[in-house]
Amino acid sequence: MGARTVEGKKGYTLSDIAKELGVNKATVSKAISGKGNLSAETRARILEFIDECGYRPNAVAQSLARCRTYNIGLMMPDQADVFDSAFFRDCLRGVCQVAGEHNYDVLMAMDNESVNENLSRLIDNRKIDGVIAMRSQVKSPVVTLLKQTQVPFVLIGTSSDQKILHIDNDNLRACRDLTRMLIAGGVRKMALLGGDENNCVTHIRLRGFREACEESGLNFQEQMIALNVTRKNQIGDVLQQAMARGVECIVCMDDYICNLVMAHLRTNGISVPQKVKVASFYDSVLLENNIPPVTSLRFDAGELGCRACRMLIDRLEGKQVLEPEIPPYQVIARESTK
């Protein structure tokens, strides 16, 4: 057994108690501090064992434990379609799964124009131990505030600041691979439809598309690029321009845009892939089950959320945070590009 840090009949440590009872250290800490979401039965069992073994918490450790909330703040984009997005739904599931396994709770806050006020309130009132930011932006008030307040956080997305803990899918290579496949299949004129330019992933996907075009000898300037396509009422005008230019394939940066594109084409009697091919840089169940099913990139956003949460908990518990392993992806060719 390890070094004794407390006095008692057997010199039990917090880790020893957790091991004896088959729970983790966070659960024992919650029982001692009286904070956190524990059942009355679990709390009573832990406190009874502590009384029997004569455990007395170290004063410094107890003081630190009182400051812990075992709450993780999760910053979600404040947009109407956020829960329609397969990425955010699956990522949220992964975060909550790992948080629950370690006896942490998740408090969700929306990343909107009031984000500084909302996040500052959580920080100032000591409601959270750390934060997971669910998107990386070119200009991010969330990251700026977290750096200023020195609250531990993990960013899901890319960052040029090597001091920031972050993890992301390999969007650059994946988008390049899918675009290469389209070009290898004979596509020469494409329209790329993307979302908010303030999101870093938009620029990464554009770069992957551009690199595939250039290395294949296609003139990137001849491809149609439409960014900031964030509303349903924009789709019709963009697709009208694309069809007028003789575009052979419409490439959508995410599943939300792609669902809107497929619905518009279907409503207007434009057959896929006979009149125009369609592909997406992000897959979802809706695209897989569409008629026809859509060629897409499949990422494991659930695993991304799991790994981000493990990184944050390791940081909060003083463990070494290792370089994260990037989850794999798949290029899935379906009927929409045949």
Give, region by region, the residue ranges found by the protein language model.
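Alpha-helical recognition/docking segments in bacterial nutrient-uptake
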Residues: 1-9, 71-180, 238-245
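N-terminal helix-turn-helix DNA-binding module of bacterial transcription factors
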Residues: 1-70, 338
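Short beta-strand segments enriched in small/hydrophobic residues
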Residues: 64-81, 181, 189-196
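Short, solvent-exposed amphipathic alpha-helices that sit
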Residues: 86-101, 174-178, 200-219, 260, ...
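Short beta-strand elements in bilobed, periplasmic/extracellular small-molecule ligand-binding domains
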Residues: 99-110, 210-232
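Hydrophobic alpha-helical segments within soluble ligand-binding/sensing domains
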Residues: 167-192, 210, 214, 231-241, ...
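An alpha-beta-alpha
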Residues: 178-218, 323-338
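Flexible loop/turn connectors
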Residues: 236-338
